[in-house]
Amino acid sequence: MQPIWTMRPAETGLAGAARRVLRTKLPPAALLAAAAVTVAAVVAATGWRAAGPAPSAAQLDEWQAMVAQAVEPHALAQLRTLARRGSGDAQAALGIALVDAREPGLRDEGRGWLETAAQADGRTDTPAARRAQLALGKALLLGSGDMPKDYARARTLLGEAAAQGDPAAAYYLGLIYRSGYGVAADPVRAAHWFEIASRADIPAADFMLANAYREGSGVPRDEARALALYRRAAEHELPEAVQTLAMAYRNGELGLRPDADEFHAQWIETAHALKHPVVAP
């Protein structure tokens, strides 16, 4: 037993093994061999820890938000490491976080990761690929930083995502065909894609589909259906829908009777909705 003044906690694990090897009185050759085995074990264990279990979707979302809001160094490093190892989810998260960054270099990096994730080695039906296609398609449709608009490429990317069931991509396809961005305007196709997005409870799609039914654009004119869709979008505090209802009550539109009280109530709600706008899909 060691004297009390020299006693130390028991050394365990690879670090303890390394120290014990160095304290052992062995011939030089044997000592070198033992040290080499120990170092190899340490390297192997370290590599295993670095790979580790894949982070959860919630963790990736948290890192994405941290990078998007403040380019937080630790979150950025984590996503870059995973993206370089081939994680499609990390590539999509990093691309989405950086595509609207202030620094041009970071924006370029973001677009690069979105391009990589959107391809997904040909497996474009993966969730990561759909997220990347949606984000890149939106950026090319609406414009992002110094990225030039490319309506044709946007339509292709959004079409691929929508074909795999992404309702937000369907909404943006509706906008493309409604306004004729890079293609002839097609009210029927626009209404079709708005209908798909509306089924997923996207308020902006409800509003655009309501407009189509109100105007008879691409679908039969149906004010009752339009009113129901406006009301559903207004329940989500979409400012445009609330304002439309207010004007309908004021002017007696959409089959409603003029109602000053409802008009004022909806007008107040419009002001509230403008302060807390619905996040775009």
Predicted regions and their residues:
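Alpha-helical tetratricopeptide repeat
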Residues: 55-64, 76, 80, 92, ...
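N-terminal leader/linker segments that initiate helical-solenoid repeat arrays
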Residues: 39-96
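Hydrophobic face of amphipathic alpha-helices that form TPR/SEL1-like repeat modules
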Residues: 93-100, 133-142, 172-179, 206-215, ...
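N-terminal intrinsically disordered, acidic low-complexity segments at the extreme N-terminus
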Residues: 1-15
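Short helix-capping/linker turns of helical repeat alpha-solenoids
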Residues: 71, 85-88, 100-102, 120-123, ...
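Terminal, low-structured helical/coil segments at or just beyond the last alpha-helical repeat
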Residues: 244, 250-281
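Structural signature of tandem alpha-helical TPR/SEL1-like repeats
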Residues: 70-74, 104-113, 147-157, 184-193, ...
